[in-house]
Amino acid sequence: MGTYGSFFIPCLRLERDKMAQIYVSGLTFCYEGSYENIFENVSFCIDTDWKLGLIGRNGKGKTTFLNLLLGKYEYQGSIRTTEHFEYFPFPVEKEMMKNFTIDVIEKIYPDYELWKICCELDLLQTDAEILYRSYETLSHGERTKVMLAVLFSKDHVFLLIDEPTNHLDRATREIVEKYLKRKKGFILVSHDRTLLDQCIDHVLVLERNQIRVSQGNFSS
């Protein structure tokens, strides 16, 4: 049960929408001016209720792949899904930093539903009063919790979560780990092997210019 001001908000378990698929077919990409393909004729299908870890050596295309999903680069082949991709962490404009956190959220996500965000914050062991503090006064951990709460309050989205536990203290890392463990519908990039082992059920492995999908966590 979460609270907002002096009112109680019943935080029922929020179920994600019915499973859909993401189809990647014949994906080929190289940066302009380069003769080496980062990805070459990559094809796979994943379900949108999977909890995927994206694994590969540094500089081998993890960020590039996320940007391709977000539509930031032109590529050959196709990426098809009925879902919309959202990225963590989302950028906050410098001029918005002094505003209340709720105003920052409204700028980024005008159609937000306050009760959903409050419920997600409750799962992250964070009081909703944080929404009425200046965003610039929030710690890195508090900002991480707010961003996750906003993203997981959205419908019809598949989340691309990039290094959510960077710069967090141990207690906050454990809260985020516990939170993500009960969620689904995301690709997680992290150097934290414990986080990957606890929170994912499938793996996207970058090998040379291919992407291989396997069931299991990081260690398996």
Predicted regions and their residues:
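ABC ATP-binding cassette signature C-motif
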Residues: 8, 12-219
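Residue-identity detector for glycine
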Residues: 2-5
